[in-house]
């Protein structure tokens, strides 16, 4: 039952997006919509942007990988106490949150 409802949602989403999103709205003339392709071409060719995207993606992969694997490795294999692991996880989370606030003010 739930799978059928989810399937209907996935069928309805493209129709809703086609009617609502301004990028594909039929009331926008072609000259205005062609700006999106110009911006897309600039984004694809910008190597610095791709470098920043890679750095952010790599950090997120390492960060979430740490929080998935670290409890098992540190607590079970290295015999670190769970309270120390909690403090370590809090320290890493605090650094990421502080960096987010610092970057938001730029």
Curated annotation (Swiss-Prot):
Name of this chain's protein: Putative uncharacterized protein RC0924
Q: Which species is this record about?
A: Rickettsia conorii (strain ATCC VR-613 / Malish 7)
């Amino acid at each position: 039952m739930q799978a059928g409802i989810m399937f209907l949602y996935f069928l309805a989403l493209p129709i809703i997006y086609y009617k609502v999103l301004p990028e594909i709205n039929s009331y926008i003339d072609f000259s205005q919509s062609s700006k999106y392709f110009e911006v897309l071409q600039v984004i694809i060719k910008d190597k610095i942007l791709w470098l920043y995207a890679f750095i952010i993606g790599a950090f997120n992969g390492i960060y979430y990988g740490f929080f998935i694997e670290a409890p098992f490795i540190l607590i079970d294999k290295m015999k670190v106490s769970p309270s120390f692991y909690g403090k370590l996880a809090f320290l890493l989370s605090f650094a990421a949150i502080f960096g987010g606030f610092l970057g938001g003010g730029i």
